Every structure is written in C-alpha cells, then in structure tokens.
Amino acid sequence: MKRFAIEFSYDGTNFFGYQGQPNVRTVQGELEKALERIFKERIFTQGAGRTDAGVHANGQVAAFNCPIDRLAAIDIKNALNANLPEDIYVKKAWEVEKNFNPRFRAKKRIYHYLVSTNEKDVFKRNYVWHFKYKLNIEAMRIAARYLEGEHDFSSFKKGNDKKNPIRTVYRIRILNVKKELILIRVEGRSFLRSMVRNIVGSLVRVGLGQWTPEKIKKVLEARSRQEAAGTAPPHGLYLYKVLF
C-alpha cells in the first residue's frame, strides 16, 4: 500500500479549526470526506499542524495511506481537488515512506501574521488584523529578539495547554511588505497552542509604545500567561510552510 503526502492551502474563515471534530466543519473532516468519496472507504489522515478556527494555511501538510497502488501523485492531487470544497486546494502530492508522519517529521514550521494599519477594508477583514494605529516596527524588532532561541514560553501559551512549554523559536522577522501592511514571520520546529498569536499580541503592545522592548523579556521570564498581552485574532494568521 502506497502512502502519500499532500501540501495544501485553505481559507480558514468557515472552518472550526483544522482537527476533525463531530458536528462541526473542519479542514481535516473535509479532507477525509473527499478521500472517502474517492476510495469508497474511510481514510485517516495525519496533519503537520492543528490550526485554530479562523486561521488560514498556505502550506499545510497531511499524509495518508492509499488503498489503490496504481495511482500516482498527480492522480491524488487531481482527484482531491475535484472532490474538495472551494476553500481547500491541494498544491502538490508526493509518495512518502510507510511511517511518514508530518507532525513528527517536521523540522521547521513557518507562520505568517498580517497586520494592516490602513483604513479598514471589509473585503480583507477575514485575512488581516486591521489595526487603526501606527506601529513602531523597529521597537517590535528589538522586542522580538528576546523571544528567539530556546525558552520556557509559558507566558505565551493558551491557558489550558499542558504540553512542555520549552520551545525553540529560530527567528522572528517583522517586515513592511506593502504600505501600511506588516508581516510578522515566526519560525520554529513546534509551537504551543495560540503561541504565535500571543507573541503577536505582545509585540503589538510594543509597537504601540505601551510597552518597551525590554518588557517582552520580563514577560517571558515571568512564565505566566497573565503577564502577556491579549491574543491576536485568528484571521491574520497563516501556516505558511512546513519544512522536512
């Protein structure tokens, strides 16, 4: 039996997150429904990341076993795109070894967060965090350096996350990609739940001048969620790429 991986994008607006759950629309649920229509049997998938409701993906990766050996990667891609809803698109497919699990094989996950400081555009409201105040990008860049490396990220986790809070952030870049559009790029091997959005929320406080860049270091060292700023909204976040 062959095993395939797929890289795919999705608009997270109308999904209750990535992970399959009963009675709600999820990305994994739609993916497995499409596979069941193709193969006429239940196919289970393993994903590289579990995005929250409203979060988008440019390069999510999932893997699954294929019960029909004669199919090639291009057949998998075409069949899935013919059966998936319009807010999910498979960009490529490839054959992988039998024990390939993208969640554990991933060496780097790259997230992008978009902040617009322009006048609100109703057509982009589900894809950027509209923020009516100007942000000091240089101060945000200084603050971001305190978060790079291996740290206890308890201050930036979701309150009920029981996982080991020690994580390594390889790099954080803050870029003006267009006039009044800021991209915050966060790279690491793995992240706690809501960790990227909590980091963004705190960096924005620095950008507003409400916190000094050094305040981020104190928040990190406090290891307390109460010390950090509020969570940035989900619709500005994208799982941009997963590297193996």
Curated annotation (Swiss-Prot):
Keyword Cell membrane: no
Top-level taxon in the UniProt lineage: Bacteria
Active site: D52 (nucleophile)
Manganese listed as a keyword: no
Record-level GO BP terms: tRNA pseudouridine synthesis
GO MF annotation: an example: tRNA pseudouridine(38-40) synthase activity
Residues holding substrate: Y111
Main EC class the enzyme belongs to: isomerase
Reactions catalysed, as given in the entry: uridine(38/39/40) in tRNA = pseudouridine(38/39/40) in tRNA
InterPro entries according to UniProt: PsdUridine_synth_cat_dom_sf, PsdUridine_synth_TruA, PsdUridine_synth_TruA_a/b_dom, PsdUridine_synth_TruA_C, TruA/RsuA/RluB/E/F_N
Key words of the record: Isomerase, tRNA processing
Function (record text): Formation of pseudouridine at positions 38, 39 and 40 in the anticodon stem and loop of transfer RNAs.
Subunit structure: Homodimer.
Stated family: Belongs to the tRNA pseudouridine synthase TruA family.
Protein name: tRNA pseudouridine synthase A
Native source organism of the sequence: Thermosipho melanesiensis (strain DSM 12029 / CIP 104789 / BI429)
Organism placement in taxonomy: Bacteria, Thermotogati, Thermotogota, Thermotogae, Thermotogales
Underlying gene: truA
